[in-house]
Design a protein with these regions (language model features):
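Active-site-adjacent helix/loop segment of glycosyltransferases
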Residues: 178-181, 185-249
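Catalytic donor-sugar/metal-binding loop of nucleotide-sugar-dependent glycosyltransferases
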Residues: 143, 153, 159-171, 177-198
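Glycine-rich, basic loop-to-helix element that forms the pyrophosphate-binding segment
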Residues: 36-55
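Short, flexible, basic/aromatic active-site loop/helix in glycosyltransferases
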Residues: 109-145
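Short glycine- and hydrophobic/aromatic-rich loop-to-beta-strand nucleating segment
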Residues: 129-136, 146-155, 159, 177
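Acidic metal-phosphate-binding loop of nucleotide-sugar-dependent transferases
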Residues: 39, 66-68, 170
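Conserved donor NDP-sugar-binding/catalytic core segment of glycosyltransferases
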Residues: 68-104
Length: 249
C-alpha cells in the first residue's frame, strides 16, 4: 500500500467514512499531511503549529491519540475562550475510561516532586503528591493552574504566538510544564471542569527503562532552565494556586 492509500484509509477510519468525508470536505475541512523527521513531542507539534500560524488559525488543539471526547466538548471550549480573552490555554476535566478523575491540573513541581516519583516509595510521598496534584480542590470548579497536562492543550493562537511554541530541547516529557508555565506568565491557563474528556494514560515512563531515562533527562533540562531549589517564581505561583482553593494545601 502506498502513502496516498494509507492516508485515505486513515482519513476514512478517523473521520467516519466516505459520506462524512464528503460532508466535511464541503464544509471546508482539510486533512493536511506534513512529512517531517521525529523531533519529539513538542517538535512534532511545532510543525503543525507553524502551519496553523500560516493559516491564521484562531485556536489550536494539541491532543494525545489515547484521548477521546464527545461532540459537545469543542464548542463549549471555543464559546468560553471567545468570551474570555484573558485565557490563553484551557483543559477540560480528564477521566480514566472507568470514570475516575485524573489529577492532571497541578502546581509547579519542585525537584522533590519530580524525583520523588522515581526514587521514593509511594507511601512516603503520598501526602505531598496530594498537595502537588491539588486533590483538596475537588476538581469541581474552574482554576487558573500553571501546569496542565499535555494530553489536551487547547491554545489561543494569538497567545501562543506571543509566548512561543514548544521548547524543542524537551524531546518527550516536561514540555507541557514548560509550555503551560510560559503561558501562565501572561495569560490564564484554565482547568475547565464543565466539560469532560477521557484519557487512557498508560504512564509509559513507569513501564519502560528507556522512557524513564528520557523522562529523567527532560526533568533535568527543565530544572536547569527554570531553577532547581532557587526558583522564586515557582513559589509565588504555587502560593497563588493555594489561595485559589482556600489555602487548604
Amino acid at each position: 500500500m502506498d502513502l496516498k492509500q494509507e492516508l485515505q484509509e486513515f482519513a476514512q477510519r478517523v473521520l467516519g467514512g466516505e459520506p462524512e468525508l464528503k460532508r466535511k470536505a464541503e464544509a471546508g475541512f482539510r486533512l493536511i499531511y506534513i512529512p517531517h523527521e521525529n523531533n519529539g513531542y513538542g517538535g512534532g507539534h511545532n510543525v503543525a503549529l507553524k502551519e496553523a500560524q500560516k493559516l491564521g488559525s484562531v485556536y489550536h488543539l494539541v491532543v494525545n491519540p489515547d484521548v477521546w471526547f464527545g461532540p459537545e466538548v469543542m464548542p463549549a471550549l471555543i464559546e468560553y475562550m471567545d468570551a474570555h480573552e484573558e485565557v490563553g490555554q484551557i483543559m477540560p476535566k480528564v477521566l480514566y475510561p472507568n470514570g475516575q478523575i485524573q489529577r492532571l491540573a497541578k502546581m509547579l513541581p519542585t525537584p522533590l516532586d519530580f524525583f520523588g516519583r522515581f526514587c521514593l516509595p509511594e507511601f512516603l510521598i503520598r501526602r505531598r503528591n496530594k498537595k502537588f496534584e491539588l486533590v483538596q480542590s475537588g476538581f469541581s470548579k474552574k482554576m487558573n493552574i500553571p501546569f496542565l497536562s499535555g494530553c489536551f492543550m487547547f491554545f489561543r493562537m494569538s497567545a501562543l504566538n506571543e509566548v512561543g511554541l514548544f521548547d524543542e530541547q524537551f524531546f518527550l516529557y516536561a514540555e507541557d510544564i514548560d509550555m503551560t508555565r510560559r503561558m501562565h506568565q501572561k495569560y490564564e491557563t484554565l482547568f475547565f471542569p464543565s466539560t469532560t474528556i477521557y484519557h487512557t494514560f498508560t504512564r509509559g515512563s513507569r513501564r519502560s527503562l528507556r522512557l524513564m531515562w528520557i523522562h529523567i533527562i527532560s526533568t533535568i533540562k527543565y530544572l536547569n532552565k527554570w531553577g532547581w531549589w532557587n526558583d522564586s517564581e515557582r513559589k509565588e505561583i504555587n502560593e497563588n494556586v493555594k489561595a485559589q482553593i482556600g489555602g487548604a494545601l
